[in-house]
């Protein structure tokens, strides 16, 4: 169910599925307020997800959905809300307004749903504190007990964003010519 997520020797784990050794160090997951002992408050993460207004506006009745289409949204629906991904995320650690791995994975689930007429609104809602803020470090992917790959999901959302006219705001004003003709004395072609 995800309610028993903890950190064991600094790595996010589900307590119910982890065999402990005598010297293991157990602590609450990171980036959440501790309520008591190993129990943390996850209400802020729930609030972030609600900001995305993830719902299906299924007014597109003529669209056929294949088994492949169902498969494309199935994995993102398997999250057990353990918050291990938020605990391991270096961006969420410094920016609590960052939507985070789970919210973005869930956004992809709704964006990939062909019957959802609300897809463009969701893509718009993930541009600020969202897809472009992720460092793509894979920390979330490594700790997910369900085998979900938030990093790949975020990369897919970045591609979908570009296809819909958005761009990475952190590279928009970057001057790629500032390196000069020879990359500051280094020639990548070896000439």
Segments from the language model and where they lie:
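Ferredoxin-type iron-sulfur electron-transfer modules in oxidoreductases and energy-metabolism complexes
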Residues: 27-30, 38-191
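A short acidic, often aromatic-flanked loop/helix-cap motif at beta-alpha or helix-coil junctions
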Residues: 34
């Amino acid at each position: 169910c995800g309610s028993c997520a903890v950190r064991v020797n600094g790595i996010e784990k589900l307590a119910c599925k982890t065999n402990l050794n005598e010297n293991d160090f157990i602590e609450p997951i990171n980036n959440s307020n501790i309520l008591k002992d190993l129990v943390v408050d996850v209400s802020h993460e729930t609030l972030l997800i609600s900001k995305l207004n993830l719902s299906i506006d299924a007014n597109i009745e003529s669209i056929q959905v294949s088994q492949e289409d169902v498969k494309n949204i199935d994995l993102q629906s398997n999250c057990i809300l353990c918050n291990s991904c938020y605990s391991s995320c270096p961006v969420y650690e410094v920016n609590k307004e960052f939507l985070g791995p789970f919210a973005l994975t869930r956004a992809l689930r709704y964006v990939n749903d062909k019957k959802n007429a609300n897809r463009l609104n969701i893509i718009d809602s993930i541009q600020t504190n969202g897809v472009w803020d992720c460092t793509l470090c894979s920390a979330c992917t490594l700790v997910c007990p369900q085998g979900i790959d938030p990093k790949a999901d975020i990369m897919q959302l970045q591609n979908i964003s570009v296809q819909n006219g958005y761009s990475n705001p952190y590279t928009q004003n970057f001057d790629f010519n500032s390196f000069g003709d020879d990359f500051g004395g280094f020639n990548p072609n070896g000439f």
